[in-house]
Amino acid sequence: MIKYDILCTKKKRGIYMLKSWTPGEMPDREEMKRQLEKTKSSLYDLQMKIKEHKLPVLVLFEGWSAAGKGSMIGKVIRNIDPRFFKVATMSAPTEEEVRRPFLYRYMKQIPEEGKFTFLDSGWMEQTVKEVLNGELEGDAYERRIESIRRFERQLTDNGYLVLKFFMEIDKDEQEKRMKKLLSKDDTKWRVTGFDKWQNKHYKKCENVFDRYMKDTNMSSSPWYIID
């Protein structure tokens, strides 16, 4: 068996509740540099062990708009062998994908033995958007959650490692980052109408995120919050 450690700023056991969660205490700059250098070398070593033991690893980065999901993935993959991972950014589903079962397009991203797949937003984001749009509620929501739990259990029961990270920022920080992106011609396209709506209705979105994380937090695939 491979022994692995999850590195993140804040880790809790059990159910992760954003409303009761507080940011982790930040180490000083020099300590952060030492940790970063140690992590860089350990990531490559870990990847080689995963390849040797033929362990497939699915890593989901979810969270708020402008929280830095893509940037975080970029920092991770910078230090590992590109032959043994892929990154998938999941945009809105196509017409064909809408006609398929909800999890169909995510199933296509499942990694091979000994490889990583990094998902820049996955089935959490799509589910949360549908809830916020009023398209998914009541029994339909419960069925969706059960299908997600079953899917994740099938993966872990069959030897996959499923890691789920939630990128957390507060309302003011999100607004600050969006304003910075909007101030430059080469980055303003990254802020969508939904991103602005999310910041305006931050509390409502937080409640939906909170419920989803509670409903999908399992011992075999728990949530990890990164601030």
Q: What is the predicted function of each stretch?
A:
Residues I6, R13-D227:
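Glycine-rich phosphate-binding loop of ATP-dependent small-molecule kinases
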